[in-house]
């Protein structure tokens, strides 16, 4: 079962289930959080609520009012007010990145994931963030294609395209 928004750590703890581990202390399973407003798409989170609780415990000032980005396969943008998760939205950020970089024309310009690890190009990532921030509604598909043209024209080196795309999608 999910705890409905607005949700706080007490509600999550109260709905957690203890499962015997067989190795000592029980394992607590948190219930997850449901955002379900009548005029909006429903949304669920499982696990990220624990990350939010930990962040609020480490940074108590954030509990008053903050917006948290939880990057990942299904990134979350969560609005926090008075220590409660009041709303959030999930995005297929990581999954979309994987599809675009591994199964589309964009990936042909990027170094293979099997190559040695490289340094993150923070400037390319920040460029992707700023292009997305300054965009108009409906521009995302054009911006994604721009990843290809930035590589083709040499405005970004191939090794930086993944970082640009990541910034664009986040």
Language-model-derived ranges and their functions:
Residues 31-132:
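Glycine-rich phosphate-binding loop plus the immediately following alpha-helix
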Residues 12-14, 48, 89, 93, ...:
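Generic structural signal for well-ordered, non-membrane alpha-helical segments
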Residues 1-55:
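Glycine-rich phosphate-binding loop and adjoining helix at the ATP-binding site
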Residues 1, 72, 170:
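Short glycine-rich phosphate-binding loop at a beta-alpha junction
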Residues 18-25, 130-142:
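An acidic intrinsically disordered interaction segment
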Residues 8, 116-121, 136, 153, ...:
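Alpha-helix capping and helix-coil boundary motifs
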Residues 133-169:
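Adenine-nucleotide phosphate-binding core of ATP-dependent small-molecule kinases
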């Amino acid at each position: 079962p999910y705890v409905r928004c607005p949700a706080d750590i007490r509600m999550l703890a109260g709905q957690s289930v203890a499962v015997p581990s067989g190795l000592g202390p029980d394992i607590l399973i948190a219930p997850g959080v449901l955002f379900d407003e009548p005029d909006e798409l429903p949304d669920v989170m499982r696990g990220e609520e624990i990350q939010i609780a930990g962040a609020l415990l480490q940074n108590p000032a954030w509990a008053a009012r903050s917006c948290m980005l939880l990057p990942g396969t299904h990134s979350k943008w969560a609005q926090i007010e008075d220590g409660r998760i009041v709303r959030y939205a999930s995005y297929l950020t990581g999954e979309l990145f994987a599809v675009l970089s591994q199964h589309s024309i964009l990936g042909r310009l990027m170094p293979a994931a099997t190559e040695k690890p490289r340094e993150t190009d923070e400037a390319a990532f920040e460029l992707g963030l700023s292009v997305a921030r300054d965009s108009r509604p409906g521009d995302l598909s054009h911006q994604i294609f721009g990843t290809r043209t930035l590589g083709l024209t040499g405005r970004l080196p191939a090794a930086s395209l993944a970082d640009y795309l990541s910034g664009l999608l986040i």
